[in-house]
Amino acid sequence: VRDAYIAKPENCVYHCAGNEGCNKLCTDNGAESGYCQWGGRYGNACWCIKLPDDVPIRVPGKCH
């Protein structure tokens, strides 16, 4: 497990405006919790706590 930005299949983050949607997205994917990271490296994006290793995360490189 790891703490990371959860990613869409094309290596794009899930942008957010609040914590509720991110917490649901993260927990639905097996994480302990999640929140909206404001003004982070990828803008306002969902950050998951203890996300399972089989769920894609944002990695260096382009979002396409």
UniProtKB/Swiss-Prot annotation:
Keyword field contains Secreted: yes
Gene3D superfamilies in alphabetical order: Knottin, scorpion toxin-like
Subcellular location: Secreted
Sorted UniProt keywords: Disulfide bond, Ion channel impairing toxin, Neurotoxin, Secreted, Toxin, Voltage-gated sodium channel impairing toxin
Cystine bridges: 12-63, 16-36, 22-46, 26-48
Expression tissues: Expressed by the venom gland.
InterPro entries reported for this sequence: LCN-type_CS_alpha_beta_dom, Scorpion_toxin-like, Scorpion_toxin-like_sf, Scorpion_toxinL, Scorpion_toxinL/defensin
Domain LCN-type CS-alpha/beta: start-end pairs: 2-64
GO cellular component, one term: extracellular region
Gene Ontology molecular functions: sodium channel inhibitor activity; toxin activity
GO biological process: defense response
CDD domains in the cross-refs: neurotoxins_LC_scorpion
Entry's family note: Belongs to the long (4 C-C) scorpion toxin superfamily. Sodium channel inhibitor family. Alpha subfamily.
Record remark on domains: Has the structural arrangement of an alpha-helix connected to antiparallel beta-sheets by disulfide bonds (CS-alpha/beta).
Role according to the record: Alpha toxins bind voltage-independently at site-3 of sodium channels (Nav) and inhibit the inactivation of the activated channels, thereby blocking neuronal transmission. This toxin is active against mammals.
UniProt protein name: Alpha-like toxin BmK-M4
Lineage: Eukaryota, Metazoa, Ecdysozoa, Arthropoda, Chelicerata
